[in-house]
């Protein structure tokens, strides 16, 4: 995520983060779809060999990534100061809890689900990929419109809470109808739809909410939360599997999702700000110039990098009026296209 932030323009970063989120979600589902089939062909040792080869391919693909020619460094704050700033922001913490809970539930489910498909749906392990793949396609069919609505019509908070509710609904179906093959598949389908929506929304929301100067720090905390969630999800899934009580297992996961929903109600609607990078004009008093810039209607955040001669600005385009544009032109010494 940090590398992606380095090689994308500030104004394109939200789109890039949403695309990365969907890629992560797809990778999980495709892996779980192909895993049983590959294991039946090459065994566990062969599966690890395939994983190693794919890791090497991923390293080779990094050669195609554009070289970073401009490094964004913040000399005004140390790393610990940035970390302190990030962990004190309530909405960012709720997003960290969200990615933790999402990946905990996903990992726990995919330790728990195979035994359910074998016992109640009577689907052999080698055929589980044929279950997951259609569910993936169906979930994407519903997930893409939800993401478009969230971004285009500024309904992110509503779609976000609806997706968590969808996860809960899928788990409730599994609690009360896991013995039915069709209810089991329906519950998994609803979970997949909600999961893919959440996986795309979380990085996008994080990019919107994190301060410019601490964005990489926020991404690091979020990524750590994600993998911690996967770790605890694997541990929890194994414990639930040993209970040999399906209803209790699904109930525990549903309880976690309900707690997550209650925490997420505290999220405020993200501000839909545009991030732009502008060349820094020749000014003697940078602090005074920054203060004047922040006083302009529609300018919400400014980070100046004197060594790079650029200014990173978050702008509320809907609040900009003709007077604001004239003030921007005066401060930058030329017309600013926003």
Predicted region positions:
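Cytoplasmic helix-loop-helix junction between adjacent transmembrane helices
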Residues: 1-24
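Intracellular juxtamembrane helix-capping segments at the cytosolic ends
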Residues: 1-8, 197-210
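Helix-loop-helix hairpin linking two adjacent transmembrane segments in secondary transporters
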Residues: 20-63
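C-terminal membrane-cytosol helix-exit motif in multi-pass small-molecule transporters
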Residues: 53-71, 260-268
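Juxtamembrane intracellular "pre-TM" segments in multi-pass secondary transporters
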Residues: 66-98
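Short amphipathic helix-loop junctions that connect adjacent transmembrane helices
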Residues: 111-127
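Helix-to-loop junctions at the C-terminal end of transmembrane segments
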Residues: 142-155
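Structural signature of the two symmetry-related core transmembrane helices
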Residues: 158-172
């Amino acid at each position: 995520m940090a590398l992606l932030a380095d090689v994308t323009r500030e104004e394109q970063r939200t789109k890039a983060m949403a695309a990365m989120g969907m890629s992560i979600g797809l990778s999980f589902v495709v892996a779980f779809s192909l895993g049983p089939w590959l294991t039946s062909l090459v065994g566990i040792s062969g599966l690890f060999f395939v994983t190693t080869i794919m890791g090497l391919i991923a390293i080779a693909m990094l050669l195609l990534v554009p070289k970073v020619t401009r490094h964004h460094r913040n000399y005004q704050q140390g790393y610990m100061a940035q970390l302190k700033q990030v962990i004190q922001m309530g909405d960012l913490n709720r997003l960290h809890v969200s990615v933790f809970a999402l990946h905990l539930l996903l990992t726990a489910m995919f330790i728990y689900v195979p035994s359910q498909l074998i016992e109640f749906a009577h689907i052999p392990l080698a055929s589980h990929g044929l279950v997951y793949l259609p569910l993936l396609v169906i979930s994407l069919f519903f997930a893409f419109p939800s993401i478009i609505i969230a971004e285009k019509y500024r309904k992110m908070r509503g779609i976000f809470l609806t997706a968590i509710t969808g996860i809960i609904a899928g788990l409730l179906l599994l609690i009360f109808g896991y013995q039915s093959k069709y209810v089991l598949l329906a519950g998994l389908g609803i979970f997949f739809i909600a999961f893919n929506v959440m996986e795309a929304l979380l990085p996008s929301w994080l990019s919107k909410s994190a301060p410019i100067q601490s964005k990489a720090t926020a991404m690091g905390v979020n990524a750590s939360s994600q993998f911690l969630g996967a770790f605890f999800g694997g541990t929890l899934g194994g414990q639930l599997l040993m209970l040999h009580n399906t209803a209790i297992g699904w109930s525990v996961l549903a309880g976690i999702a309900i707690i997550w929903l209650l925490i997420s109600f505290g999220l405020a609607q993200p501000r839909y700000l545009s991030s732009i990078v502008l060349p820094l004009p020749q000014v003697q008093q940078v602090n005074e110039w920054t203060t004047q810039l922040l006083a302009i209607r529609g300018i919400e955040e400014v980070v100046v990098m004197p060594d790079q001669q650029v200014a990173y600005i978050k702008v509320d385009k809907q609040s900009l009026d003709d007077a604001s544009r004239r003030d921007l032109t005066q401060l930058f010494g030329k017309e600013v296209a926003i």
